[in-house]
Amino acid sequence: MNARGCAGRIMKSKSIRGRQAKALVDGSYNERKGLAGFGVYLRVPNKVHELYGYVDRPGDSSKNILGEVTAALIAIKYAIKEHCSKITIVHDCKGIEKWATGEWKRNIPLTQAYHEDVNELMKSIDVSFQHVKAHSGDENNNRADKLAKQGCGLK
């Protein structure tokens, strides 16, 4: 997993002080197709972006976690592209924050690479995390969930 490879490459980007983004991210997994889906509901000043897709990594057993970390990386990269100086990642998977900050051990290559990629991206943008309970009625979190399912062909 490489931040530069998950959604294209971001070249140098000058952020605008005070410009903030908020992204609700989620992952899903389609057992039948063997695809991890990612969903990002991203708000930047004066814009809303809905991003979704799938990641296919044969032999990878991380299932929806692959979609979760991909969504977070794409959200951060997109905020950098939008010249934001700060992004809040709202997630329902505690690992999104805990692997990034090093609070949890990174026992598999996916979480190790995610930690490295997020920390590299943090050189260009201030990243904070906010946990929400999954399927708790939060409309925007539900939207990210639907996007992730759509990304891997579940809806």
State what each model feature region is.
Residues 4-66, 77-78:
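RNase H-like nuclease fold core
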Residues 28-34, 73-143, 147, 152-154:
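RNase H catalytic domain
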Residues 67-71:
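Loop-to-helix element that buttresses phosphate recognition and phosphoryl-transfer chemistry
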